[in-house]
């Protein structure tokens, strides 16, 4: 049996529907309960049904909230608990859960990928390497191969865009800002970027690095190609990818080579892209890839919809992920979601058990710090490297585990992504800071191995403590496989409070049920 919302996200005042798949069983009844945090907000009973049914659970006039859905199904003498979650927002851009698609042959048209991403509450989907060429995104050919030789059906791409829209998911076209093919470069050699030896920058002898400066014809050509992706294919926005290198280069547009700094050019490229695409789509989605956290300091405040960071060495420890999130929040003024694209090579190089442990720990760390993790995509797959098409497929069991983590994230959306929550982990605990004290276990506020990683965030009415168990983990490198953490019990925390406490609750995606339990 299965339970999931019909859409990845719902808008304020929209009817919320859940799909209950009874897997052909004859069911006497199902009791549906909807919770906001720990408060029961809706309940109904559905009697006598077989197979799939849609259950309407009402409309929610709220601007930003996550809800938990629990359904108890009675079939004969058996009672089965099913759980899912959904969120309601006044603007989808307030909560962006990023996933990916990369398979676009005719055979992939109905491969179940969109349906799976919907069950995982992925509401923004990057279409990786969907285009004909990086310098010529849209082709009229029905069947073509991309620059890496991958076969693509144009109709499959368009069908997936349509299907995503039906599920409340926004399709984002991958469009590298830097790359052109060799034939294009040879026609426009002065549009490229050059090193100090005045040789063109080229990546794997395929991609020529182009000049995105304000006065470069490449910038205008690129934005025109983005426009075609939206008008001809139906994409909702653009993923502006970069390579991360070079950071300085020479332009050959003038009479003599001129050194330019790309961190000074990229923000205006983002803003100009936003302004020009607004003419074809009133509110296009725009994501820029800060590869290795560069240049977040100059791009975070630009007119984009998230601060997106692709995480690479030397950002290699758990503490670095929290650092990236905190800095991105500061540079952006906390005005937009933060997404970490942190790919896990243990799914290629280590045992599946250790890889799954690494995935659960890393995602928990990112979510606990108020950001989103780009890892999942296609049909039950995860990313292990920067070339998305070489993803790793999960088993049904492992896919269900990561899906449950997503359910938990959405159910407690208010506690993870409230913009008013401040991270006080490093200032309110340890040494002579008595606001928070752990009296029973070794804890770390920056993700040390063999300790409980405790992140503390608070606002005027809530104090949130997020525990990630690193006990039994031999190191704190996020991109290495991990042994199964050793369960910890009887944790005692002392918290200083300034007013009467209304309630203390604990919840976890690892138990039998996700409903928060009161702590006496």
Where are these regions (language model features)?
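Aromatic- and acidic-residue-enriched carbohydrate-binding clefts of CAZyme catalytic domains
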Residues: 131-157, 184-215, 244-264
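An acidic-aromatic substrate-binding cleft motif
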Residues: 81-133
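Active-site neighborhood of glycoside hydrolase catalytic domains
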Residues: 214-307, 311-326, 332-333
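Short, acidic/polar
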Residues: 104-119, 218-231, 290-298, 356-363
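Active-site-adjacent "subsite" loops/lids of carbohydrate-active enzymes
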Residues: 91-92, 103-107, 173-233
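Aromatic/acidic polysaccharide-binding cleft in carbohydrate-active enzymes
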Residues: 242, 335-427
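Beta-strand-enriched, solvent-exposed domains that form extended recognition/catalytic surfaces
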Residues: 1-91
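Carbohydrate-binding surface patches
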Residues: 438-499
């Amino acid at each position: 049996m299965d339970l999931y919302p019909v859409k990845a996200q719902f808008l304020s005042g929209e009817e919320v529907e859940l799909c209950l798949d009874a897997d052909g069983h004859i069911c006497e009844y199902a009791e549906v309960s909807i919770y906001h945090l720990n408060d029961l907000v809706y309940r109904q009973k559905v009697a006598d049904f077989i197979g799939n049914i849609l259950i309407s659970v009402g409309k929610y006039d709220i601007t930003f909230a996550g809800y938990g859905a629990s359904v108890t199904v009675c079939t004969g003498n058996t009672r089965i608990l099913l759980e899912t979650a959904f969120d309601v927002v006044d603007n989808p851009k307030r909560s962006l859960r990023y996933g990916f698609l990369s398979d676009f042959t005719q055979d992939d048209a109905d491969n179940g990928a969109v349906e799976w991403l919907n069950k995982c509450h992925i509401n923004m989907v990057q279409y990786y390497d969907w285009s004909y060429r990086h310098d010529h995104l849209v082709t009229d050919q029905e069947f073509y191969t991309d620059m890496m030789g991958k076969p693509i059906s144009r109709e499959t791409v368009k069908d997936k865009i349509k299907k995503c829209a039906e599920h409340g998911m926004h399709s984002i076209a991958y469009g590298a800002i830097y790359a052109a093919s060799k034939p294009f470069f040879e026609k426009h050699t002065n549009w490229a970027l050059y090193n100090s030896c005045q040789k063109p920058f080229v990546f794997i002898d395929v991609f020529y690095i182009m000049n995105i400066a304000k006065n470069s014809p490449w910038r205008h050509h690129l934005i025109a190609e983005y426009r075609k992706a939206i008008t001809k294919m139906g994409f909702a926005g653009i993923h502006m990818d970069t390579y991360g290198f070079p950071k300085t280069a020479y332009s050959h547009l003038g009479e003599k080579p001129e050194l330019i700094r790309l961190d000074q050019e990229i923000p205006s490229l983002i803003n100009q892209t936003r302004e020009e695409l607004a003419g074809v789509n009133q509110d296009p989605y725009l994501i820029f890839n800060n590869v290795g956290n560069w240049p977040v300091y100059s791009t975070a405040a630009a007119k984009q919809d998230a601060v997106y960071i692709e995480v690479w060495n030397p950002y290699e420890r758990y503490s670095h992920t929290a650092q990236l999130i905190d800095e991105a929040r500061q540079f952006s003024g906390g005005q937009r979601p933060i997404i970490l694209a942190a790919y896990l090579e243990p799914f290629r190089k280590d045992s599946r058990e250790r890889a799954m442990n690494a995935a659960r720990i890393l995602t928990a760390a990112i979510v606990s710090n108020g950001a989103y993790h780009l890892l999942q995509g296609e049909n039950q797959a995860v990313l292990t490297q920067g070339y998305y098409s070489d993803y790793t497929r999960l088993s049904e069991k492992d896919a269900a585990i990561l899906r449950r983590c997503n359910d938990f994230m959405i159910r407690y959306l208010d506690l993870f992504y409230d913009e008013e929550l401040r991270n006080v982990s490093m200032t309110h605990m340890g040494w002579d800071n008595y606001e928070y004290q752990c009296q029973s276990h070794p804890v770390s506020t920056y993700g040390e191995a063999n300790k409980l990683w405790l992140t503390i965030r608070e606002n005027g009415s809530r104090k949130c403590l997020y525990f990630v168990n690193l006990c039994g983990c031999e190191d704190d490198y996020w991109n290495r496989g991990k042994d199964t953490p050793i369960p910890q019990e009887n944790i005692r925390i002392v918290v200083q409070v300034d007013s009467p406490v209304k309630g203390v609750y604990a919840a976890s995606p690892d138990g039998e049920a996700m409903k928060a339990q009161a702590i006496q």
